[in-house]
């Protein structure tokens, strides 16, 4: 399983420098939608990292798909986006058990 990152240039640069190969740089909402759809269809991606603000800008149906996605598991970083979940909540949703208990 691979890690993918979707975001604006300043968000994805660090991931790119860290060696992440599947980096999708976006400039607007249509490019964001296209990148998210591409990642959701790619079965080799296990984790998707996005900024909360970019997720909040997506259409409702696409946000719902991301929130319900088990593979890839979506990790939202930064901001205080609507419906943001902690990493703990995401792992609990994906695995079905709270591993911190």
Curated annotation (Swiss-Prot):
Localization annotation: Cell membrane
Primary localisation category: membrane
Pfam families: ATP-synt_F
Gene name, Swiss-Prot/TrEMBL: atpF
Keyword Ion transport: yes
GO biological process: proton motive force-driven plasma membrane ATP synthesis
Parts of the chain that traverse the membrane: none
Name of the protein described by the UniProt record: A-type ATP synthase subunit F
InterPro entries for this protein: ATPase_V1-cplx_f_g_su, ATPase_V1-cplx_fsu_bac/arc, ATPase_V1_fsu_sf
